[in-house]
Design a protein with these regions (language model features):
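Glycine-rich phosphate/pyrophosphate-binding beta-alpha loops
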Residues: 152, 156, 210-225, 304
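ATP/nucleoside-binding phosphotransfer catalytic cores, i.e., glycine-rich phosphate-binding loops
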Residues: 2, 196-199, 228-229, 238-326
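Gly/Ser/Thr-rich active-site loops/lids in small-molecule metabolic enzymes
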Residues: 167-175, 219-220, 225-249
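A generic structural signal for short beta-strands and their flanking turns/coil linkers
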Residues: 188-190, 205-207, 230-235, 286
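Glycine-rich beta-strand-to-loop/alpha-helix junction loops that act as flexible
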Residues: 18, 71-73, 94-97
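Short glycine/serine/threonine-rich phosphate/pyrophosphate-binding segments
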Residues: 53, 75-80, 99-101, 128
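ATP/NTP phosphate-donor binding region
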Residues: 1-68, 78, 118
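Catalytic core of DAGKc-family lipid kinases
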Residues: 47, 85-90, 96-211
Length: 326
């Protein structure tokens, strides 16, 4: 059944990573959905090395786009969302990357491009939170960026920085395991000061600290089991394993307990009977400030963002509208 025609200027925009997508197929699928919905002609904007999506999305907004389709990896989605934050114009996800982290956490189609595009034109709106990170460098300069899934400092960011792009293209998220193995020999605890929601500052040493708007990673890893993208708070996980056996306990916690046992009533009962793992610490809050003794690698949604001396992260509740299947 063909939808009622929309005003001629009612159109979508597609922000796409030309390296990640099959452009001819994408154009054909969008044209079909656009016609079925009775929309005007879709506008197309490629990303580039200089622009992950922020600038072209602002252009699309200036041109009156009613919905913006993000076709690319996690970096493209993050860039588009950064520009759409608090605009009221929805984003539609066309997963085309390695991790597809936000789509995975929202339980959206990962491999059905036609269904993903259809949601852009006929789906319903879902409002989710956006994490904001202000990053201060060692030279005193600072910059502010959005994140949708996780921001991390320490080991996880170092793993991302060390990931082999060719291996990542060949085996996907498994390339991070190779990077982690290479990062471990030189790994030292990160000494930092932190404050959550304005509480008195505390000092600790961790191997990595992750601030999450969502909790799931590829491979069935549920790092933050209580994280929800629309609960108005950020979840914080600190990994501080004591020796090699500590890393085994960390893996057991996030892969087995969080990823498997929590999915059943019996499994949750087993977790309740076991002692809590001190190598993985959890907290929640709306505002986190942390300063490290020495600059550390920092990442946002799986993309490296250089070294940070301090980070101020907070949540912008309900700031992003996402199109999901009706």
């Amino acid at each position: 059944m063909t939808a009622a025609p929309q005003p001629e200027d009612h159109h979508a925009a597609v922000i796409y990573n030309p390296i990640k997508v099959d452009l001819a197929r994408l154009e054909a699928d969008v044209a079909e959905a656009e016609a079925a919905a009775g929309w005007g002609t879709t506008q197309w904007y490629p990303t580039s090395v200089e622009d992950a999506g922020q600038s072209v999305t602002k252009t699309a907004l200036d041109q009156g786009a009613a919905v913006v389709l993000a076709a690319g990896g996690d970096g493209t989605v993050r860039g588009v969302a950064e520009a759409l934050r608090d605009s009221g114009v929805p984003i539609a996800l066309i997963p085309s990357g390695t991790g597809n982290l936000l789509a995975r956490n929202l339980e959206l189609p990962l491999t059905d491009q036609v269904a993903s595009i259809g949601a852009a034109f006929t789906g319903v709106d879902r409002h989710i939170d956006v994490g904001i990170a202000e990053i201060e460098r060692a030279d005193g300069t600072s910059e502010e960026h959005a994140f949708l899934v996780m921001a991390g400092l320490g080991l996880d960011a170092k793993m991302i920085a060390l990931t082999n792009p060719k291996l990542k293209k060949a085996v996907g998220w498994l390339a991070y395991i190779d990077a982690g193995v290479r990062a471990l020999p030189d790994l030292k605890p990160v000494k930092l000061r932190f404050s959550i929601d304005g509480a008195p500052e505390r000092t600790t040493s961790v191997h990595t600290i992750i601030v999450g708007n969502c909790g799931a990673l590829p491979g069935g890893i549920l790092l933050m089991p209580d994280a929800k993208p629309d609960d108005g708070v950020l979840d914080i996980a600190a990994l501080k394993p004591s020796g090699p056996f500590g890393w085994v306990k960390v893996w057991n916690k996030v892969a087995w307990e969080n990823g498997v046992l929590r999915k059943s009533t019996l499994g949750r009962s087993i977790i309740d009977l076991t002692s809590d793992v001190k190598d993985v610490l959890y907290a929640t809050g709306t505002d986190l400030r942390m300063t490290v003794e020495q600059p550390q690698e920092f990442q946002l949604d799986g993309d490296e963002f250089g070294e940070a001396k301090s980070v101020h992260a907070w949540v912008d509740p309900g700031a992003l509208t996402v199109k999901v299947p009706a």
